[in-house]
Design a protein with these regions (language model features):
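Long, low-complexity, charge-rich intrinsically disordered regions
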Residues: 1-165, 252-352
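Short alpha-helical segments that sit at the start of domains
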Residues: 157-188
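Short, cationic-aromatic polyanion-contact patches
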Residues: 174-183, 231-255
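Helix-turn-helix/winged-helix DNA-binding modules
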Residues: 178, 194-195
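Short, locally clustered residues in the helix-turn-helix/winged-helix DNA-binding domain
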Residues: 188-194
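Short acidic, hydrophobic short linear motifs in intrinsically disordered regions
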Residues: 195-206
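Short amphipathic alpha-helical interaction segments
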Residues: 208-224
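A short, conserved structural fragment
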Residues: 222-233
Length: 352
């Protein structure tokens, strides 16, 4: 029986592609850097932020430039929504630390206040390096309150506001219109999922707010006559709006609305896949055991993978170690393919 670790090149390549994707998105949103692509989808700012704060722990420059962007554009971010999408305690602490730093250096007036830090006996190093622990002479006083040790940081002042006409920044146009609120997210979901006739559960999941917040936003929009509700069952309703009228209001010609991607689900699955890969990289196991771990990962995340439209390997057709190859192609490669450019002129519609 062959005993080996997961090929380090596979994990490193996967991590590199996630970091590159994050750089590409933020560069289009105003972070200092070269925007080498022009995506035709609408990004979810808080989902991308929760994702980036984790993957950028291995890319300090990206982490710091995103903080600078947050400082400049703090009034465009929903702290509550960010915490809602931070599904793990460590992610929530990272988000709280980032919000606290941005609030300290921002000139924007918002009603949002980051939660106070927690008592930590042994703070952990924020940045992770394969070459060993980073020496920190002067820890940042804000981050250490949230349990993270990193070098003291001042704003780079290189960031810019998002260009509202870019498809990727569509969410910010709606926030300009409705404020940073559940209403802005509800309208975004209804506009971009217009043909799908989303149910309340779909809207709640994509909006990133509580069910109560989404209900209140929908009721207000229905009362205002800009959203239409149809009773489809005793306890089931569908919602829609006049896409042409909204496109005209927003100055979007020929109904060329951005593509919808279910970013919270997709980015969370990608993050969990990276964590899983890194854990396998540290231990030796047979090809059979690695394939067994892959089978377990698919089973643990089957609901999310199927919701994203990922075609899962047939466990009956691929037995034992034979499961690994189709897993790599059908799951890993497919998820990465969804991060490839979707241009304003046309492209793959991910996760519709």
């Amino acid at each position: 029986m062959q005993i080996s670790k997961m090929p380090s090149g596979l994990t490193a390549s996967f991590r590199h592609q996630l970091v590159s994707f994050a750089w590409d998105q933020w560069s289009q949103m105003g972070v200092s850097g070269h925007a080498g692509r022009r995506d035709g989808w609408s990004i979810d700012p808080e989902a991308l932020l929760a994702f980036t704060l984790r993957v950028a722990r291995r890319e300090p420059r990206l982490f710091d430039e995103v903080l600078d962007w947050m400082r400049l554009n703090l009034d465009l971010i929903s702290a509550q929504r960010l915490r809602n999408l931070a599904l793990e305690e460590e992610t929530e602490e990272l988000a709280s630390a980032a919000l606290a730093w941005a609030s300290t250096y921002s000139t924007k007036v918002t009603r949002q206040k980051p939660p106070s830090g927690r008592e930590v006996e042994e703070p952990e190093l924020l940045f992770i390096r394969s070459t060993g622990a980073m020496s920190v002479r002067e820890p940042d006083p804000i981050f250490i309150r949230y349990g993270f040790v990193r070098p003291s940081l001042e704003p780079s002042n290189k960031s810019r506001p998002p260009v509202r006409s870019a498809s990727i920044n569509f969410s910010f146009r709606l926030r300009d219109l409705f404020g940073v609120s559940a209403r802005a997210e509800v309208v975004r979901v209804l506009l971009l999922l217009h043909g799908a006739k989303p149910r309340i559960r779909d809207i709640v999941h994509a909006a990133g707010y509580s069910r109560q917040n989404v209900y209140e936003a929908l009721n207000a929009l229905v009362s205002a006559g800009v959203v239409f509700m149809r009773q489809t069952g005793p306890r089931d309703r569908s919602y829609a709006l006049d896409q042409d009228r909204w496109a005209a209001l927003l100055g979007i010609e020929d109904r060329k609305l951005p593509y919808f991607v279910e970013w919270p689900r997709l980015l969370e699955v990608l993050w969990k896949l990276l964590v899983w890969m890194e854990s396998l990289e540290t231990k030796e196991s047979s090809d059979y055991m690695q394939a067994s771990e892959a089978r377990r990962f698919v089973a643990d995340h089957e609901i999310d993978l199927q919701a994203l439209g990922v075609k899962l390997p047939d466990h009956r057709s691929f037995l034992g170690a034979d499961y690994w190859a189709p897993f790599e192609v059908l799951v890993v490669d497919d998820l990465l393919e969804r991060l490839q450019p979707a241009s304003d002129e046309g492209g793959r519609r991910n996760s519709e």
